[in-house]
A protein has these predicted regions:
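Conserved catalytic breakage-reunion loop centered on the nucleophilic residue
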Residues: 3-190
């Protein structure tokens, strides 16, 4: 194992967050950059997203609602705060996408946990990041203030698992949610 990888692994196993960019809703603590502090404005948006999902709204509906209410996207909000991000500045600062909403709904960090080793690469020459199964991820509870309660997070994951797309006929196929693409792993709909 290479020195840099060994250091990253040791840090990750101690519970130090390995991510460079903190999740939307948090900012780095000025005294200790490894610690996250709740950003009240962005945290309210995160709570609203979880609340809308609990009420049965899907990611696209939530994104459209946020866009209609002129809520800044995470990258536009960070740019306004003067925080550098890897994303380019969006043309429309309120143009929410369903993928952004899904990414927020799937982040366990909002429950106050630090989650390390979410992805891996096969070797240092392989640049492709692969998702690590939940069993191989290192989850450290109560490392920072929670925005969402654990019970709410679990309920949202349950609600999202039970959602499915409507077909043209309005009926669900018996294979809905059971058949996945062999290439990309996405759910197939019929």
């Amino acid at each position: 194992m290479y020195k840099r990888q060994a250091v990253q692994k040791a840090k990750g196993e101690r519970g130090v967050p390995l991510t460079t960019n903190v999740p939307y809703g948090y900012v780095k603590d000025l005294e200790n950059p490894c610690r996250w502090v709740v950003d009240p404005v962005a945290a309210d948006v995160v709570k609203r997203i979880f609340d809308l999902c609990m009420k049965g709204r899907g990611p696209m509906q939530i994104a459209n609602q946020l866009k209609a209410d002129k809520v800044l996207t995470p990258s536009a909000y960070r740019a306004l705060q003067g925080i550098k991000t890897p994303n380019k500045k969006p043309e429309d600062p309120c143009d929410w996408h369903s993928s952004t909403v899904v990414a927020i709904l799937e982040r366990r960090e909002y429950t106050g946990c630090t989650v390390n080793f979410k992805t891996y690469t096969n070797s240092i020459w392989d640049k492709k990041q692969r998702d690590n199964p939940l069993e191989k991820q290192a989850i450290f509870p109560n490392t920072h203030e929670a925005i969402i309660e654990e019970a709410v997070f679990e309920k949202v994951q349950q609600v999202r698992q039970q959602r499915h797309r409507n077909t043209r006929t309005g009926r669900s196929s018996i294979f809905s949610g059971l058949v996945y693409c062999a290439d990309c792993g996405e759910k197939l709909y019929y």
